[in-house]
Amino acid sequence: MTPERKEKLDRVLSKRQPDVTIVLENVFDSHNISAVMRTCDAAGVQDIYILNTKIPRHKKWGAKSSSSAAKWLTVHQFENAEECFRELRKSYSTILTTHLSDNAVSLYEIDFTRSVALVFGNEHSGVSDEIREMADGNFVIPQVGIIRSLNISVACAVTLYEAFRQKNNAGHYNGQRIDDARFKELFKEWGGREEI
Protein backbone atom coordinates (compact mmCIF):
# COMPACT_ATOMS: atom_id res chain seq x y z
CA MET A 1 0.00 0.00 0.00
CA THR A 2 1.31 3.42 -0.90
CA PRO A 3 1.73 6.05 1.82
CA GLU A 4 -0.88 8.15 0.01
CA ARG A 5 -3.43 5.32 0.08
CA LYS A 6 -2.79 4.66 3.79
CA GLU A 7 -3.17 8.38 4.53
CA LYS A 8 -6.49 8.47 2.65
CA LEU A 9 -7.89 5.45 4.51
CA ASP A 10 -6.74 6.91 7.85
CA ARG A 11 -8.32 10.28 7.00
CA VAL A 12 -11.65 8.80 5.89
CA LEU A 13 -11.89 6.47 8.90
CA SER A 14 -11.07 9.27 11.31
CA LYS A 15 -14.15 11.14 10.05
CA ARG A 16 -16.62 8.24 10.26
CA GLN A 17 -19.59 9.06 12.52
CA PRO A 18 -20.68 6.10 14.67
CA ASP A 19 -23.70 7.88 16.14
CA VAL A 20 -25.84 8.37 13.04
CA THR A 21 -27.24 5.75 10.70
CA ILE A 22 -29.77 5.28 7.93
CA VAL A 23 -32.42 2.54 7.88
CA LEU A 24 -34.18 1.74 4.60
CA GLU A 25 -37.46 -0.14 4.97
CA ASN A 26 -38.63 -2.22 2.00
CA VAL A 27 -37.00 0.02 -0.59
CA PHE A 28 -37.60 -1.72 -3.91
CA ASP A 29 -35.21 0.02 -6.28
CA SER A 30 -31.59 -1.04 -5.79
CA HIS A 31 -30.50 2.17 -7.53
CA ASN A 32 -32.17 4.21 -4.78
CA ILE A 33 -30.36 2.14 -2.16
CA SER A 34 -27.07 2.65 -3.98
CA ALA A 35 -27.59 6.40 -4.19
CA VAL A 36 -28.25 6.47 -0.43
CA MET A 37 -25.06 4.46 0.13
CA ARG A 38 -23.06 6.99 -1.83
CA THR A 39 -24.45 9.81 0.32
CA CYS A 40 -23.72 7.85 3.51
CA ASP A 41 -20.09 7.43 2.47
CA ALA A 42 -19.80 11.10 1.53
CA ALA A 43 -21.22 12.25 4.88
CA GLY A 44 -19.14 9.81 6.95
CA VAL A 45 -21.94 7.42 7.90
CA GLN A 46 -20.41 3.94 8.20
CA ASP A 47 -23.43 1.75 8.99
CA ILE A 48 -26.58 1.38 6.92
CA TYR A 49 -29.48 -0.92 7.75
CA ILE A 50 -31.57 -2.54 5.01
CA LEU A 51 -34.87 -3.92 6.35
CA ASN A 52 -36.86 -6.09 3.94
CA THR A 53 -40.00 -7.50 5.53
CA LYS A 54 -42.15 -7.48 2.39
CA ILE A 55 -39.66 -7.86 -0.45
CA PRO A 56 -36.82 -10.33 -1.07
CA ARG A 57 -33.38 -9.64 0.40
CA HIS A 58 -31.26 -7.53 -1.95
CA LYS A 59 -28.34 -9.41 -3.46
CA LYS A 60 -26.70 -6.51 -5.27
CA TRP A 61 -26.84 -2.75 -5.49
CA GLY A 62 -27.08 -0.48 -8.53
CA ALA A 63 -23.37 -0.03 -9.27
CA LYS A 64 -23.80 3.13 -11.35
CA SER A 65 -25.55 4.94 -8.52
CA SER A 66 -23.24 3.85 -5.73
CA SER A 67 -19.86 4.27 -7.43
CA SER A 68 -18.93 1.18 -5.39
CA ALA A 69 -19.83 2.92 -2.11
CA ALA A 70 -21.19 -0.36 -0.69
CA LYS A 71 -17.68 -1.76 -0.28
CA TRP A 72 -16.78 1.13 2.06
CA LEU A 73 -19.89 0.75 4.25
CA THR A 74 -21.05 -1.80 6.78
CA VAL A 75 -24.38 -3.02 5.42
CA HIS A 76 -26.71 -4.73 7.91
CA GLN A 77 -29.57 -6.63 6.26
CA PHE A 78 -32.63 -7.73 8.22
CA GLU A 79 -35.88 -9.47 7.33
CA ASN A 80 -37.42 -9.08 10.79
CA ALA A 81 -38.31 -5.63 12.13
CA GLU A 82 -37.99 -6.57 15.81
CA GLU A 83 -34.49 -7.98 15.28
CA CYS A 84 -33.47 -4.88 13.35
CA PHE A 85 -34.75 -2.56 16.09
CA ARG A 86 -33.04 -4.62 18.80
CA GLU A 87 -29.74 -4.06 17.00
CA LEU A 88 -30.46 -0.37 16.42
CA ARG A 89 -31.26 0.20 20.11
CA LYS A 90 -27.80 -1.11 21.05
CA SER A 91 -26.10 1.78 19.25
CA TYR A 92 -28.61 4.61 18.77
CA SER A 93 -30.53 6.39 21.52
CA THR A 94 -33.27 7.74 19.24
CA ILE A 95 -34.98 6.25 16.18
CA LEU A 96 -36.95 8.64 13.96
CA THR A 97 -39.00 7.89 10.86
CA THR A 98 -39.74 10.12 7.91
CA HIS A 99 -43.48 10.55 8.05
CA LEU A 100 -45.87 13.44 7.53
CA SER A 101 -47.94 13.46 10.72
CA ASP A 102 -49.31 15.97 13.21
CA ASN A 103 -46.57 15.17 15.72
CA ALA A 104 -43.69 15.17 13.23
CA VAL A 105 -40.84 17.56 13.93
CA SER A 106 -38.96 19.47 11.28
CA LEU A 107 -35.65 18.03 10.12
CA TYR A 108 -34.09 21.27 11.38
CA GLU A 109 -35.32 20.62 14.94
CA ILE A 110 -33.39 17.34 15.26
CA ASP A 111 -30.20 17.49 17.33
CA PHE A 112 -27.76 15.53 15.20
CA THR A 113 -24.98 15.92 17.75
CA ARG A 114 -26.76 13.12 19.63
CA SER A 115 -27.09 9.47 18.63
CA VAL A 116 -29.86 8.88 16.06
CA ALA A 117 -31.11 6.33 13.54
CA LEU A 118 -33.19 7.70 10.66
CA VAL A 119 -35.73 5.45 8.94
CA PHE A 120 -36.82 6.02 5.34
CA GLY A 121 -39.69 4.00 3.86
CA ASN A 122 -40.26 2.57 0.43
CA GLU A 123 -40.94 4.52 -2.72
CA HIS A 124 -44.69 3.90 -2.77
CA SER A 125 -46.09 3.86 0.75
CA GLY A 126 -43.34 5.30 2.93
CA VAL A 127 -42.56 3.97 6.41
CA SER A 128 -44.98 1.26 7.56
CA ASP A 129 -47.32 1.65 10.54
CA GLU A 130 -45.43 -1.15 12.31
CA ILE A 131 -42.12 0.69 12.09
CA ARG A 132 -43.63 4.05 13.07
CA GLU A 133 -45.04 2.43 16.21
CA MET A 134 -41.62 1.01 17.12
CA ALA A 135 -39.81 4.32 16.57
CA ASP A 136 -39.45 7.26 18.96
CA GLY A 137 -40.98 9.86 16.65
CA ASN A 138 -41.36 11.23 13.14
CA PHE A 139 -39.70 14.01 11.21
CA VAL A 140 -40.39 15.83 7.97
CA ILE A 141 -38.29 17.77 5.51
CA PRO A 142 -39.96 21.19 5.18
CA GLN A 143 -41.32 21.79 1.67
CA VAL A 144 -43.37 24.53 0.04
CA GLY A 145 -44.28 22.90 -3.28
CA ILE A 146 -47.42 21.17 -4.52
CA ILE A 147 -45.94 17.68 -4.30
CA ARG A 148 -45.24 16.87 -0.65
CA SER A 149 -42.62 14.19 -1.15
CA LEU A 150 -39.06 13.75 -2.37
CA ASN A 151 -37.32 10.80 -3.98
CA ILE A 152 -35.91 8.65 -1.18
CA SER A 153 -32.29 9.23 -2.20
CA VAL A 154 -32.87 12.99 -2.34
CA ALA A 155 -34.64 12.99 1.04
CA CYS A 156 -31.79 11.02 2.54
CA ALA A 157 -29.18 13.38 1.07
CA VAL A 158 -30.98 16.48 2.38
CA THR A 159 -31.26 14.87 5.82
CA LEU A 160 -27.68 13.63 6.03
CA TYR A 161 -26.28 16.98 4.99
CA GLU A 162 -28.22 18.71 7.76
CA ALA A 163 -26.67 16.14 10.10
CA PHE A 164 -23.27 16.84 8.51
CA ARG A 165 -23.71 20.60 8.99
CA GLN A 166 -24.57 20.25 12.67
CA LYS A 167 -21.88 17.67 13.38
CA ASN A 168 -19.27 19.69 11.51
CA ASN A 169 -20.18 22.83 13.49
CA ALA A 170 -19.87 20.78 16.70
CA GLY A 171 -16.39 19.55 15.71
CA HIS A 172 -17.40 15.93 15.18
CA TYR A 173 -15.23 15.67 12.05
CA ASN A 174 -12.14 17.08 13.77
CA GLY A 175 -10.98 13.83 15.34
CA GLN A 176 -11.54 10.09 15.37
CA ARG A 177 -15.03 9.15 16.60
CA ILE A 178 -15.04 5.39 16.07
CA ASP A 179 -13.21 3.28 18.63
CA ASP A 180 -9.73 1.95 17.89
CA ALA A 181 -10.86 -1.67 17.46
CA ARG A 182 -13.46 -0.71 14.84
CA PHE A 183 -10.95 1.60 13.14
CA LYS A 184 -8.45 -1.26 12.78
CA GLU A 185 -11.12 -3.73 11.67
CA LEU A 186 -12.38 -1.40 8.92
CA PHE A 187 -8.86 -0.46 7.86
CA LYS A 188 -8.09 -4.14 7.36
CA GLU A 189 -11.39 -4.75 5.50
CA TRP A 190 -10.61 -1.84 3.21
CA GLY A 191 -7.29 -3.36 2.21
CA GLY A 192 -4.93 -1.87 4.74
CA ARG A 193 -2.15 -3.73 6.50
CA GLU A 194 -2.60 -4.91 10.10
CA GLU A 195 -0.17 -2.37 11.51
CA ILE A 196 -1.71 1.08 11.53
Where are the language model's segments positioned?
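Post-transcriptional modification and biogenesis factors for structured RNAs
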Residues: M1-I196
